[in-house]
Amino acid sequence: MESTDKLTDTNAILAYLYETFPLCFIAEGETKPLKIGLFQDLAERLADDSKVSKTQLRVALRRYTSSWRYLKSVKAGAQRVDLDGQPCGELEQEHIDHAQAMLKESQEKAKAKRAAQTPKAAPAGKAPAKKAPKKVAVPARKTERPAKAAPKVEPVVNLVQAQLTDLAKKQRVNVKLGMTPVAGVITDINKEDIHVQLDSGLTIKVKAEHILL
């Protein structure tokens, strides 16, 4: 029987790692580059911990190492650290270049997405034509509407295919429907059939291979 304390949300798993390995996973401020092969050490250290699975740890680790905060820490002179915060050697230039390229690409994508969602302004030098004011006793005032704020850009989350053993009732998951994953909650697990209630209210039955975490 699965523990009722099992963590299913990636943010909750990251918070657990911040608490369990505070010298390795930094919750706020500048982070430290992680030891190569740290996932294996993490999986072994938490092998008897029923709160997390290897799949969930892999998703959380990928989220942590793809964040801008982490990519900015991969720079010349920085030391990699293990789970206990012990130095494991300096970074190689190849890894620094790769991290900076990933950071630049991610920032450019976010900038392009914001630009696409922001209403286009009138071209410079082409002011809208003004009509001659009408002569009236009391000129009517136009109510100015406040400009709409640009929608908040959500961070890109890398989803991975779930294993049946990683799933539990009331767990938040994403279901592969066409090209775009759809969010929902697991309502029942019957052998290999997973019943998921989508956020739209629709309940569907899928296999574990169609579930993303």
Swiss-Prot record:
User: Where are stretches of biased composition, namely Low complexity?
Assistant: 115-127
Choose one Gene Ontology CC annotation of this protein and give it: cytosol
Return one Gene Ontology term, BP aspect: post-transcriptional regulation of gene expression
| Keyword 4Fe-4S (UniProt) | no
Q: Quick check: keyword Cytoplasm in the entry? A: yes
Sorted alphabetically, the keyword list is:
Chaperone, Cytoplasm, RNA-binding
For this protein, the record's SUPFAM superfamilies field holds: FinO-like (SSF48657)
Principal subcellular localization: cytoplasm
Q: Where is this region: Disordered?
A: 105-150
**A molecular function (GO) term:** RNA strand annealing activity
Q: Which InterPro entries match?
A: ProQ, ProQ/FinO, ProQ/FinO_sf, ProQ_C
Pfam families in alphabetical order: ProQ (PF04352), ProQ_C (PF17516)
Q: Which domain of life is it from?
A: Bacteria
Instruction: Enumerate the subcellular locations listed in this protein's record, separating them with semicolons.
Output: Cytoplasm
Q: Read off the HAMAP family from this record.
A: ProQ (MF_00749)
Query: What family does this belong to?
Result: Belongs to the ProQ family.
Functional summary from the UniProt entry: RNA chaperone with significant RNA binding, RNA strand exchange and RNA duplexing activities.
Protein name per the record: RNA chaperone ProQ
